[in-house]
Each structure stands twice: as structure tokens, then as C-alpha cells.
Design a protein with these regions (language model features):
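Walker B catalytic acidic pair
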Residues: 71
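Active-site-proximal or metal-binding-adjacent scaffold patches in catalytic folds
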Residues: 1-66, 75-114
Length: 114
């Protein structure tokens, strides 16, 4: 099942990333998908790399897009400062409500083993 989810998210990101890179004017050198327990995404600005949480595929499209743009903007602005907030507002005007929506979801589903 994880393989299927990964393929679905990869397919979606293959469409989202080029579109948003062009809009924002950034280029991500490398990106990947992995399971993360505490984050929806990460960005290594120096390496030009972003990682997105596999669990995103289970969330609404708007939330996936929000996290994708959020991480791409970290290629421009490392910190969550005023400039970063202004960029988020420029590209995703309703980002605050999407962030709240995403934070209402469980980050990941832990499998219970007996």
C-alpha cells in the first residue's frame, strides 16, 4: 500500500512542482518523498532539496499544494520571517486557513503490532 501511495504522490508532485517552480522563479535541485513523524515537509536550502511527507497524499489537494509551495519558498527565505509570510500570502492567499486545516489532521498513522 505504501508503494501505491508513494506513486500517487510522486505523480501529483510531478505536476505541481514544475508549475510552482515557474510561478515562484525557483528551481529545486532534488526532491523526494519519505515518511516523517513530525513534519509535513523539509527544505535544505544549501542543497536545493525538499522532502515531502508521504502522509500528504491522504490529505486534501489544497493542503498538498500549500506544503509544496511552503517548502519551495524556503529556497528563497530560510526562516519563517516577515518576508516568508509575505511570499506565502502572495502565492497562496488563504495559506493560514490551509495550515490550520492541515494541523487538524493526524500527521501519521502508526501501525499497532501485537
Amino acid at each position: 500500500m505504501l508503494h501505491w501511495y508513494r506513486g500517487q504522490l510522486r505523480s501529483l508532485l510531478n505536476e505541481l512542482l514544475p508549475r510552482w517552480q515557474e510561478k515562484i522563479g525557483v528551481s529545486v535541485g532534488n526532491w523526494g518523498i519519505k515518511r516523517m513523524k513530525t513534519r509535513w515537509g523539509t527544505c535544505n536550502q544549501k542543497a536545493g532539496r525538499i522532502w515531502l511527507n508521504l502522509e500528504l497524499i491522504k490529505k486534501p489537494f489544497a493542503c498538498i499544494e500549500y506544503v509544496t509551495v511552503h517548502e519551495l519558498l524556503h529556497l528563497i527565505e530560510k526562516k519563517h520571517n516577515e518576508n516568508f509570510v509575505n511570499l506565502m500570502t502572495k502565492y497562496i492567499p488563504k495559506w493560514r486557513s490551509l495550515k490550520q486545516e492541515l494541523n487538524r489532521f493526524i500527521l501519521s498513522h502508526e501501525e499497532w503490532k501485537f
